[in-house]
Every structure is written in structure tokens, then in C-alpha cells.
């Protein structure tokens, strides 16, 4: 029996508003526990919620960027459940009239493009956060009432790789709109994954398992990969899949059962009595639509068509708005686009990944990178020397020209000076000359290495090669 994997994702994104969705409480991350909450957030008797218009604008902006249809009439509902981090015993969410529906995004995996549908995007408030210790449980209500959008995909993904690509693309689009920073480590982007298997050709879905507590895109992919194998083994051996909630454990590389679901959750939704229905007219929609900036796909296409970058470079540079904006600022200062792209995708990304930092955390500026690239273009420094300059720029900042002068790193491009060095090296390496003339090409590499060593790596490489061949041919 051949089985097909069905994957759908539910993503919660925290909106970057200055105050909470139904109160004036601040939304700063990392504050002392229970210092950013109010009687409205905690549901004290007699208090009333007031809808944050900016949260609605942000939700519409995200929905439009995800190609959703925007509702003209939308409303809020009470989702009833009891849990210690939910002090009101209900959550204000949206049930049957979400703000956005029927959207899609396009992903690319192994060179193949695929459209993934988005069922709905709705607004809701976040719950508090429970921390469990050996002595008991602690609850921080700072997060209670934070504005969220929940983005529910269609079950259109067929592999864990597609799920990863979907999340990467979704995060990129949301970041470009500016409505959220999408930092998983701070909880501003959270993902639950639903996965089931069915025989190829069957229309009815199999019984799904829900994966929770997935704190990185890599964990989402790994969790789905394991769950795919687990369910396949169970089904092929004649077993049945139970509807379960599971979590991915990185230590064991497995998904672990959290609880078995006997039926669907009954949250007893009913319209929120303290909030009127919301009417969104065309003028409001167009005002929000006009605020949407250039999105990653459009920017990627422009980089290829107008700037002349390879498609791969354009893809990597536009994955995050931060990197893309940095690139644009650098080339606006006069640096060659392809050379700038090479440095960003190579040395810069390698440094950021190793140090677990973002561009805003380092001293390197677009102007600094641009000047360094232009020094390479002019032949003032070689790419090898540039790495020394780069290390200084990204750690401490500064002016590339001043760094080059202070450290004596100017590339030697005077032909007379280099010819003298080349002659001395050749005089001391007669055997290497003979080896090269006898067809051993590696000998030339040895000679170049000796010349670079003698000049402390500051010789102009193309000029060295030219002079070296000229001098060898004279002998």
C-alpha cells in the first residue's frame, strides 16, 4: 500500500502594536512578570474591552499580503475554556467571520513551485504563560491580551520539506509587511502542525496527529519527518492511528505523546457580547492596501530583472527584509551588486550564523561594506586582504580606507616592485620552474604562494600571475 502524507499548519503571529488588543496595557517583551497587565486583561467584573484599531490594520495588512479576501463584516467571539493562564475562562477570538479567508502563498522546493492555500486568518488575544517548577506552577499574565493573528493553512503540503518552505515564506512575507518581527525565541511566532497519512488516490483524510511545542522551523520539519515514519509503520503493520497531541523531543529525535483526543474540542463559541460587529468598507481596505511595501517575490524578481543578480542570490538576499534592505543600501552607495551579494551570502551570513546574531547586532554598516567592496573593485585591496578588513568592520565598525591605512594593508600593484619580488623567488626556486615547464601546473601555485608569503599577502594576484608567467618564459 502506497501512502500519501497530508500536512496542514496553524501559525500564531504576535502583532507589533504598542498596546494590547483590547486594553491600553504595554506590549514590551521581557518585562518583569505581571507588570504589563490590567483589570481588562484579567477580566475583572464590570470592565469592557476596547478594540485596538492598529491591530485590525495589521491583521488586514497581513491578510492582503497573503492574498486573502478581506471580510466586509467581521465579528469577535468567545472561545470558552478553563486553564490557569486564561484568567477570564474565555478567549476573545473570531469563529465564523474571520477577517481574511481564501488566501495563498507560493513556495519552491527542489526547483518546483507550488501554491499552498490559506483557509483563514483571524484576530484573537493571547493567553498568559505558565511556568512549571518542582514546587508548583507560576503564571505570568504579561502576554495575556497580546494581539495575535492565527493563520490556518489548507492541508496542501505533502512533505516536511514543503512545510519548512511554507513557514520560511510565511515568515518572510509577514516581516516585510512590518506587522510582526516573527521571533520564535520570543514567542512572537508559534506553530502547530497537523499530519495524517492516507492511501494514494483516497480522498478521505486519515486520522491526524497534532504536533505542539515546536520552537523552530527545523523542529517542525524534524517532528513531521519522525511522525510520518511512525504513522507509516503503524498503518503498514495493520494498526490504527489515534487522534493525538504530541510534541517533538530533540534529545530522542522522536515525537512523544502528550494526550489522546477522544473527540473534537468543544469551546462553546458564541458572539462576544461586549464588542459590536466590525464593518470594513472599501475605503478602509484601500488605505491599508496602499501601506503594503514591496514583498519578497516582487523584490526577488526586480533583483534578477533590473539588477542582474542570479536567481539564487536574489532568493537568499530577500529571505529577510533586514538583509535585503542592507543590500540595497550598500549598492546605493556605489558598490558592485554581485560582489556585494557574494560578501553578504558568504562572509556576513557565516559570521551571523556562527555568532547567532542578526545584522542589527553587529557593527557592520551598509556604507562600510560598500566602501570595502569598492576598494576591492579599484584594486586597492585583494579579496584576501578584504577579509582582514571585514573582521574589523563587523566587530568594531569604522572606515575601510582608514583601517587599510592603519594596518598597512594596501595591495601592492606597482609592477616594478612585484617584478623584483618575482625575480627573487624564481632565482631561489629553479626546480619549480623546470617542473612547470614539464607540465606540472601545481608548481605555479607553489610559486604564487611564495610570492604572496614574501609580500604578506598584499600582492595583486592577477598582476602576480601575469609577471610570473612573463619571467618564467624568459628563462
Swiss-Prot record:
Q: Which domain of life is it from?
A: Bacteria
* One BP term from GO: glutaminyl-tRNAGln biosynthesis via transamidation
Q: Which reaction does it catalyse?
A: L-glutamyl-tRNA(Gln) + L-glutamine + ATP + H2O = L-glutaminyl-tRNA(Gln) + L-glutamate + ADP + phosphate + H(+); L-aspartyl-tRNA(Asn) + L-glutamine + ATP + H2O = L-asparaginyl-tRNA(Asn) + L-glutamate + ADP + phosphate + 2 H(+)
The cross-references to InterPro entries, in alphabetical order and at most eight, read: Asn/Gln-tRNA_amidoTrfase_suB/E (IPR017959), Asn/Gln-tRNA_Trfase_suB/E_cat (IPR006075), Asn/Gln_amidotransferase (IPR018027), Asn/Gln_tRNA_amidoTrase-B-like (IPR003789), GatB (IPR004413), GatB_C_1 (IPR042114), GatB_Yqey_C_2 (IPR023168), Gln-tRNA_amidoTrfase_suB_CS (IPR017958)
PROSITE patterns linked to this entry: GATB (PS01234)
Q: Does the keyword Protein biosynthesis apply?
A: yes
Q: What GO molecular functions are on record for this protein?
A: asparaginyl-tRNA synthase (glutamine-hydrolyzing) activity; ATP binding; glutaminyl-tRNA synthase (glutamine-hydrolyzing) activity
Query: What HAMAP family would the database entry show?
Result: GatB
Similarity-based family: Belongs to the GatB/GatE family. GatB subfamily.
Q: What does this protein do?
A: Allows the formation of correctly charged Asn-tRNA(Asn) or Gln-tRNA(Gln) through the transamidation of misacylated Asp-tRNA(Asn) or Glu-tRNA(Gln) in organisms which lack either or both of asparaginyl-tRNA or glutaminyl-tRNA synthetases. The reaction takes place in the presence of glutamine and ATP through an activated phospho-Asp-tRNA(Asn) or phospho-Glu-tRNA(Gln).
| PANTHER family associated with the record | GLUTAMYL-TRNA GLN AMIDOTRANSFERASE SUBUNIT B MITOCHONDRIAL AND PROKARYOTIC PET112-RELATED, GLUTAMYL-TRNA(GLN) AMIDOTRANSFERASE SUBUNIT B, MITOCHONDRIAL
Question: Could you identify this protein by its name?
Answer: Aspartyl/glutamyl-tRNA(Asn/Gln) amidotransferase subunit B
Q: Which organism is it from?
A: Bacillus anthracis
Amino acid at each position: 500500500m502506497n501512502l500519501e502524507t497530508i500536512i496542514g499548519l496553524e501559525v500564531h503571529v504576535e502583532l507589533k502594536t504598542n498596546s494590547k488588543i483590547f486594553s491600553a496595557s504595554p506590549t514590551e517583551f521581557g518585562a518583569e512578570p505581571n507588570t504589563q497587565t490590567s483589570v481588562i486583561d484579567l477580566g475583572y467584573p464590570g470592565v469592557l474591552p476596547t478594540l485596538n484599531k492598529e491591530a485590525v490594520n495589521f491583521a488586514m495588512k497581513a491578510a492582503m499580503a497573503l492574498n486573502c479576501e478581506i471580510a466586509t463584516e467581521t465579528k469577535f467571539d468567545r472561545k470558552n475554556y478553563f486553564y490557569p493562564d486564561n484568567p477570564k475562562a474565555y478567549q476573545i477570538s473570531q469563529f465564523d467571520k474571520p477577517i481574511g479567508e481564501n488566501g495563498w502563498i507560493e513556495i519552491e522546493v527542489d526547483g518546483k513551485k507550488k501554491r499552498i492555500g490559506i483557509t483563514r486568518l483571524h484576530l484573537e488575544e493571547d493567553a498568559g504563560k505558565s511556568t512549571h517548577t518542582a514546587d508548583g506552577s507560576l503564571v505570568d499574565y504579561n502576554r495575556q491580551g497580546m494581539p495575535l493573528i492565527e493563520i490556518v493553512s489548507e492541508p496542501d503540503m505533502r512533505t516536511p520539506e514543503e512545510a519548512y518552505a511554507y513557514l520560511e515564506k510565511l515568515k518572510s512575507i509577514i516581516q516585510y509587511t512590518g506587522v510582526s518581527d516573527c521571533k520564535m525565541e520570543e514567542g512572537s511566532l508559534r506553530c502547530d502542525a497537523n499530519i495524517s497519512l492516507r492511501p494514494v488516490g483516497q480522498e478521505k483524510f486519515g486520522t491526524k496527529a497534532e504536533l505542539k511545542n515546536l520552537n523552530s522551523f527545523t523542529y517542525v520539519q524534524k517532528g513531521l519527518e519522525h511522525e510520518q515514519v511512525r504513522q507509516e509503520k503503524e498503518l503498514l503493520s495493520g494498526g490504527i492511528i489515534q487522534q493525538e497531541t504530541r510534541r517533538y523531543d530533540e534529545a530522542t529525535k522522536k515525537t512523544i505523546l502528550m494526550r489522546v483526543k477522544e473527540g473534537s474540542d468543544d469551546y462553546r463559541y458564541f458572539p462576544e457580547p461586549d464588542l459590536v460587529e466590525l464593518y470594513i468598507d472599501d475605503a478602509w481596505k484601500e488605505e491599508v492596501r496602499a501601506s503594503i511595501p514591496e514583498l519578497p517575490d516582487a523584490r526577488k524578481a526586480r533583483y534578477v530583472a533590473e539588477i542582474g543578480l542570479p536567481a539564487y542570490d536574489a532568493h537568499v538576499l530577500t529571505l529577510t527584509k533586514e538583509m535585503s534592505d542592507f543590500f540595497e543600501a550598500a549598492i546605493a552607495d556605489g558598490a558592485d551588486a554581485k560582489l556585494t551579494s557574494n560578501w553578504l551570502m558568504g562572509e556576513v551570513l557565516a559570521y551571523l550564523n556562527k555568532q547567532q546574531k542578526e545584522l542589527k547586532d553587529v557593527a557592520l554598516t551598509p556604507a562600510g561594506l560598500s566602501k570595502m567592496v569598492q576598494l576591492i573593485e579599484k584594486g586597492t585591496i585583494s579579496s584576501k586582504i578584504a577579509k582582514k578588513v571585514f573582521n574589523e568592520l563587523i566587530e568594531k565598525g569604522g572606515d575601510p580606507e582608514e583601517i587599510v591605512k592603519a594596518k598597512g594593508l594596501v595591495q601592492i600593484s606597482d609592477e616594478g616592485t612585484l617584478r623584483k619580488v618575482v625575480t627573487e623567488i624564481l632565482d631561489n626556486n629553479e626546480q619549480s620552474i623546470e617542473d612547470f615547464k614539464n607540465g606540472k601546473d601545481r608548481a605555479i601555485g607553489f610559486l604564487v604562494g611564495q610570492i604572496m608569503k614574501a609580500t604578506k599577502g598584499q600582492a595583486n594576484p592577477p598582476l602576480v600571475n601575469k609577471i610570473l608567467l612573463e619571467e618564467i618564459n624568459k628563462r
